Amino acid sequence: MSQVTARVLNSGMRLPPLPTIRELVKLYKLQAMKQLSQNFLMDERLTDKIVKSAGRIDPRDIVLEVGPGPGGITRSILRRQPQRLILVEKDRRFGETLQLLRECASPLDMQVDIYYDDILRFNIEQHIPDTTQRIHLIGNLPFSISTRLLINWYADLAARRGAFRRNDTCMTLTFQKEVAERICAPVGSEQRCRLSVMSQIWTEPVMKFIIPGKAFVPKPQVDVGVVKLIPLKQPKTQLPFSLVERVVRHIFSMRQKYCRRGYGTLLPPDSREETTQTLFQRADVRDTLRSFELSVPQCLRLADAYAEYIKEHPEVEAYDYRGPKNPDVSGAAAASS
């Protein structure tokens, strides 16, 4: 860090004055695009609160922001002065606005990198090869990709790859209020679903606060929840992510019925009832519970039981209850039971 920059930071000087986000939107004739699920957050008190929810951001840290748009949250991040800020934005219309923010950050020795890319395809590991610096993931997520992105990141977290090669990469993200509540839903809650269990296997999700829809432009028909997801230091399972995700997805496919109904669809019909009962006994889980009444340990014991079963009957792993009937798989499983 240069002596000039040190003096700037020590003096408490802030970023140079910029047009407000509302002025920038008007200046560049920016309009939110429905197909990109865009909603702009104009209130800097709220963007500051989102970034504050991420916790301490040190001068050596890297922040990756998803979908900065006109730069509301971006400005709040820059005030925290990370060493590097990576912006991943799919919509090139925001280029001039984001370039202006980069120029304002440059005198303070903050590196701002802008990538016009789809976060679902963005290779974080390629752009952040160094694992000595802590990473924060922050974003006002488009509603249309939020669940898919989160599941992708959980897969990375389970494999210790991408942004999660260290075990301290926290995610501070916005979701539709209903989705945010599902992520954090406890056992027995009517809102508990696949996303609840997957989130709670690999992270500790914390609902930070709710933003009313009227704070966004254009105003969405729903309120928004800000959730911080803190990776667990010790994972709750060593099973492959894909297997756990498959089992949990099947369990919750019939969430209002007894959990054995959804779980049973993992198995060919010829041996389904008997095998399902056996696996529930192995897992020490009552099969008359409904899926939203299952705890994370119970779901993982059911995943363990299924993993052991497909070791004994490898042909069952390929079974897909939605596909065409496969007498070879059903017959083989029944014969070997």
UniProtKB/Swiss-Prot annotation:
Purpose: Probable S-adenosyl-L-methionine-dependent methyltransferase which specifically dimethylates mitochondrial 12S rRNA at the conserved stem loop.
PROSITE patterns xrefs: RRNA_A_DIMETH, SAM_RNA_A_N6_MT
EC number assigned by the record: 2.1.1.-
Gene: mtTFB1
GO annotation (BP), single: mitochondrial transcription
Major subcellular location class: mitochondrion
Entry's Gene Ontology cellular component terms: mitochondrial matrix
Key words of the record: Methyltransferase, Mitochondrion, RNA-binding, rRNA processing, S-adenosyl-L-methionine, Transferase, Transit peptide
Localization per record: Mitochondrion
A Pfam short name: RrnaAD
Protein name, per record: Dimethyladenosine transferase 1, mitochondrial
Protein family (similarity comment): Belongs to the class I-like SAM-binding methyltransferase superfamily. rRNA adenine N(6)-methyltransferase family. KsgA subfamily.
Family matches, as Gene3D superfamilies: Ribosomal RNA adenine dimethylase-like, domain 2, Vaccinia Virus protein VP39
Taxonomic superkingdom: Eukaryota
EC category name: transferase
GO MF, any single term: RNA binding
Transit peptide segment: 1-84
InterPro entries linked: KsgA/Erm (IPR001737), rRNA_Ade_diMease-like_C (IPR023165), rRNA_Ade_Mease_Trfase_CS (IPR020596), rRNA_Ade_methylase_Trfase_N (IPR020598), rRNA_adenine_dimethylase (IPR011530), SAM-dependent_MTases_sf (IPR029063)
Amino-acid positions noted as binding S-adenosyl-L-methionine in the UniProt annotation, renumbered to this chain: 38-41, 67, 89, 118, 140
